[in-house]
Amino acid sequence: GITGNRDKILKQFSGGKNSILLGASSFWEGIDLPESALELLIITRLPFDSPDEIMNRAHNKLLQQQGKNPFYHSELPKATMRLRQGIGRLLRTEDDHGVAVVLDPRLQTRRYGKTTLSSLPPDLPINSKKTAELISITQKFLQNGKEGKVN
């Protein structure tokens, strides 16, 4: 594997073929991987901030003092925006194509999941699939390129 700062890792990733990049939160913002540099994006969990970070605790306490629910007024909107940004890395231009897989079951099991999904671009096909089915569909899409269809 390659270690180092984000820019070094991105440079190595961009120069490789059939590369896999495992990235943490620093890869959610400010990167541009055009065309076929990024075709498969796997998001393991929704990008919520840690509620234990001191700034989040202070902000959440302030919201509570104002009678607001910190989750719905702050945490969920930020996570939804980051999810949109992450998927946006996959589809930067009309010529880009790819598959975004979100493994976090909360999109299906929590009330806020439907709202989060509805915030994604309206022309983005969204499907809920079992793992075996997902692997097959993703392989077909990547083999067929832009013309691949996900059902």
Identify the residue ranges that each predicted region occupies.
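ASCE RecA-like P-loop NTPase motor cores
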Residues: 1-151
